[in-house]
Design a protein with these regions (language model features):
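Short, well-structured segments within or immediately adjacent to enzyme catalytic domains
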Residues: 32-212
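Amphipathic alpha-helical segments typified by the pilin-like N-terminal helix
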Residues: 1-36
Length: 212
């Protein structure tokens, strides 16, 4: 009986040591996959710009200065990064983040078929906060083009990529960076929406913190 208790105690100790390592490995794998997805988005934007007089995908008239995580409007119109679908990528899953609950790649693919409005896990800057319309414009050097969409509403969490611990950021030259984030709205890369489903929360603080 004593020997059995000793064995159980040893197993418990080993489990307590291994579980954090396993959790860390899973988190790291999601982080790598997230970087891969947002990097693919950057490459698609580059291809799009080469076919469109150097311009990045626009949202729609009147929203040129907005940042948005929307791919498709309820009327079926693809906007912003959604304009990359079909012509520049056939895989809608790249718009999902494995570390953003409810907005993983497979969930985005599922929503493409069943929901009128299609959200991405990533916030697209468009021409807001001083980002020039032409991708290769010198003004865009060291400026971010997209990032994990981390958002908190008055009623609770809506978008919580990587548990608000860090954010994956895509820059105009297609390189990606992973930076520490905070769940406190507007402190780093997390924004706050007045209500669930608000399309255009104030995201200027995100780009202020991403740009170098």
């Amino acid at each position: 009986m004593v020997e059995l208790l000793v064995i159980i105690a040893v197993i418990c100790i080993l489990a307590s040591l291994l579980l954090p390592a396993v959790a860390g490995s899973i988190s790291r794998a999601r982080q790598i996959a997230c970087c891969g997805n947002i990097n693919q988005i950057g490459r698609c934007v580059t291809l799009y710009s080469s076919d469109n007089q150097g311009c990045i995908p626009n949202i729609q008239p009147g929203m040129e200065q907005s940042s948005i995580p929307i791919l498709r409007l309820p009327n079926g119109t693809f906007i912003a990064l959604g304009r990359l679908l079909n012509s520049y990528t056939a895989d809608v899953r790249i718009f999902g983040c494995p570390g953003s609950p409810g907005y993983e790649g497979d969930k985005i693919a599922e929503n493409l078929l069943r929901t009128p409005m299609l959200w991405s896990a990533y916030l697209y800057r468009s021409c807001s906060s001083g980002f020039a319309e032409r991708l290769a414009d010198p003004a865009n050097v060291d400026k971010a083009l997209a990032a994990d969409f981390a958002c908190i509403t008055a009623s609770g969490e809506q978008f919580a990529p990587h548990d608000y611990m860090y954010s994956t950021i895509l820059y105009s030259d297609c390189h990606t960076e992973i930076r520490r984030n905070s769940r406190t709205p507007f402190e780093l890369y997390t924004v706050q929406a007045a209500r669930h489903g608000e399309l255009i929360p104030d995201c200027s603080s995100v780009w202020k913190n991403t740009d170098k």
